[in-house]
Amino acid sequence: MNKMQMLKNEHVLVLGLAKSGYAAASILHEHGVNVTVNDQKPFEENEPAQLLSEKGIDVVCGSHPLRIFEDKDITILIKNPGIPYENVMVQEALRRQIPVWTEIELAYHLTSSPFIGITGSNGKTTTTTLIYEMLKKDSQKTLVAGNIGTVASEVAANADGDEWIVTELSSFQLMGTVEFRPKISLILNIFDAHLDYHHTREEYEKAKQKVFVHQHEDDIAVINLDDPSVVKLAEGSKAKKVFFSVKEPVEHGAFIQHGAIYYMNEHIIDVKDVVLPGEHNQENILAAICVVKNAGCSNDAIVHVLTTFGGVKHRLQFVDTIQSRKFYNDSKATNILATSKALSAFEQPTILLAGGLDRGNEFDELKPFMKHVKGMITFGETAPKFVKLGEELGIHHVKHVDNVEQAVPAAFNISEEEDVILLSPACASWDQHKTFEERGDMFVNAVHMLK
C-alpha cells in the first residue's frame, strides 16, 4: 500500500484556505479522501470555499466549531502554515493527539519523486532558484515548489515520480511535517526570525531542524560550517553530511580560496565570473553547488547558471540605471540580517529605502553596515525608528514619506551620479501591503516612472 492509498482511510480537516489549503482540499477530494474544510472567513465572502463546496466538499465557514472533530471523526488536520498553533482548532487536534500537518507533509505522501528541501532564515529563494536552474540546465527532470511558486502539494500530485522536486521550506511549513524525508536537505543559516510565531529561538530552530530529522544514512544533509547553530542542529542527523564555508577550505564540500570556488578541491569557477551581486550570495552559491553535485549535476551546467543568473525578483534585483544611478529591489529583505547583507553588497554611496511592519525590533544592528549610506528614505510603522537611526549615525539626508511610491522620487532627488538607490526594508510589508512582492512591484513601477 503506497502513502496515498493509506490516506484514503483518513478523515482530514483542512484548516484555512489561501493557496495551500485550497490545493490540499481539492487534491484530497480528487483522490477520494474524506475531507472537510474550515475557514474563518464567512462563506458568502469566501470564493475558494464556494468553489470547493461546488465540488462536493464539506465546508464550514465563519467560525471554528470544535464539534467538527466529533461530527466528521477527524483523524488528520492539515493547516495553513500561517495559522498559529494557538488556534482553537489546532489546540483541539493536539489535545486529541490528532496529527497536525502542513501541505508539505501532504506533498510528501502524494509522490515517490525525491525532494530537495531548502530552508534557512535568509537566502532560501535565491538558493532554491539556483538549484532548480542548475539541474534544469543539466537536463535533469526537475520541478520547483513551496514558497517560491506553485504549492508543493499541486506539484507533487502532478509529478511522474522520477523528478527532483526542489522545495523552498519555511519554518511554518516544516513545523507541520511528520514523516517528510527529503533526499537532499539544506539549512542555509539560522537567525532570529518569526519569533512572534515561534515565541523562542529554540522552537524556531526545532522547526528548521525538521528538514533533516527523518533522513536516512543514504540521504544528504548540506550544512553551513560557518553557522554554529546549523552545525549543532545537524549533529543528530543520520544523513551523510556535506559542508560549505566562505571562511575556510572544507574537505567534504564547497569553499572559496584565492578568488575561486571549489567543490571537493575541484575548481568550479572564478568568483569574478559570477554575475550574482553581493558577497552574501557566495554562501547561497556554495550551498547550491553542494546540493546539485550530490544530485549528479555537471560542472558545465553549474558554470552556465553562475555566469548568466543575475538574481531573483525582489531579492537584490537590479532594476535599472537612470542618469547613472543604479536601482535595486530587495523587497524580500524582511529582517535585519537580510538588509545588512544587502548593504554589504555595495561600496558605492547608497540611499537606503527602509521601513514597514513594526515587530518590536530595534535597528541598531544595522549600524556597522551603513558606512556607505549617505541618505535614508523611510516609510511604514517603523519609520520613526529609522529616522532616529539616521540621526544617530549623522546621515545628512533622512526623510519620512508615506510609502514606497513616494520614496523613489525622494531618493532620486537627493542622489548623485554613480549612487545606488536600494530598497531593502528590513521589515515585513504587511502594514501597507499584502505581500513583499506587492511592495517590490510598487518600487519597480516608481523607478520606471522616473524615466
UniProtKB/Swiss-Prot annotation:
Q: What family is this protein classified in?
A: Belongs to the MurCDEF family.
Which purpose does this protein serve, as stated in its record?
A: Cell wall formation. Catalyzes the addition of glutamate to the nucleotide precursor UDP-N-acetylmuramoyl-L-alanine (UMA).
- Top EC group: ligase
Note the InterPro entries from the entry.
Mur-like_cat_sf, Mur_ligase_C, Mur_ligase_C_dom_sf, Mur_ligase_cen, MurD
Q: Hey, which pathway is this one from? A: Cell wall biogenesis; peptidoglycan biosynthesis
**UniProt KW keywords:** ATP-binding, Cell cycle, Cell division, Cell shape, Cell wall biogenesis/degradation, Cytoplasm, Ligase, Nucleotide-binding, Peptidoglycan synthesis
User: Does Cell cycle count among this protein's keywords?
Assistant: yes
Task: Name the EC number(s).
Answer: 6.3.2.9
Q: Where in the cell is it found?
A: Cytoplasm
Q: Which domain of life is it from?
A: Bacteria
Keyword check for Endoplasmic reticulum, yes or no: no
Q: Which organism is it from?
A: Bacillus pumilus (strain SAFR-032)
Give one GO term, molecular function aspect.
Answer: ATP binding
Gene3D superfamilies, sorted: Mur ligase, C-terminal domain, Mur-like, catalytic domain, NAD(P)-binding Rossmann-like Domain
Q: Which GO terms describe its cellular component?
A: cytoplasm
What is this protein identified as? UDP-N-acetylmuramoylalanine--D-glutamate ligase
Q: What is its main location?
A: cytoplasm
